[in-house]
């Protein structure tokens, strides 16, 4: 190699190193984000969130770490969106219906009551999100309707939620009307009130203490495993499994948009992929853990498991349609989302109901039928 060629080669190598060096430095940096959750550390969903964070950590080679904070560590559950928007915390975890006070359309995305009155179950609701245009409407809620500095990502389908826990058994809707009942916030609470039920909202960690003080007669939270972890069985001995109020219930992680935009495209893709993995993780986790929890509640804690009184179902669906149709007249985004769900349901529900009938009848015919 000539002297000139050697100088050119060395110059090219130096130039290449100069271009690559900043990339290498960035790749070696570790970003740490604190995520304020709406669940206590005893919740199984807190554990699932930590598993989500562990996936992000491993997939990023340790360059992105998400620290999960239990409910109330920095702000309480209903303040999470504002805290993420303002950068008080880097991210948050809750459900979209927690922000119903900002826009009622939020409830249609995480937990449309009675499948938005369309017959959509949890899996078909998630199918609407990913195959029916629902995810774009989800993003539109935050970016255009609420105009918050937030990047939202769905990650935990945890329903269907039971009607809930009762101190005394009920046999009808009239019995339930006599009780003070903890329900989710937003339009679901309005639906219960339309039915004549005295419904109040409060964070999950406050429910058992309120029941112990006699403030509540009945309550719903999430499901058998998580509710047992929070000690519901210590104050309630009657559990009603079928609940229309959250026939689906999808959690979300919210990132402060400024913090999110500082992540590389690769790190953003890792978070989004880990969130999709968390979907499967939550589905499979719930099937077994909730079934095992019901057995334990019956055998170890003498909780009586009941079917929900039949007259609650038509009353709930009727009240849902009243509240939703009324809200659609006032809120353009609510109307857009509801119409999208109804159009999707017309295609999916006839087929999916028949398929679900297979599994229902197969279960009844099995030696494990109850």
PLM regions: where:
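N-terminal secretory/targeting leader peptides
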Residues: 2-125, 145-370
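A gly/proline- and charged-residue-enriched helix-loop-helix capping module
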Residues: 120-138
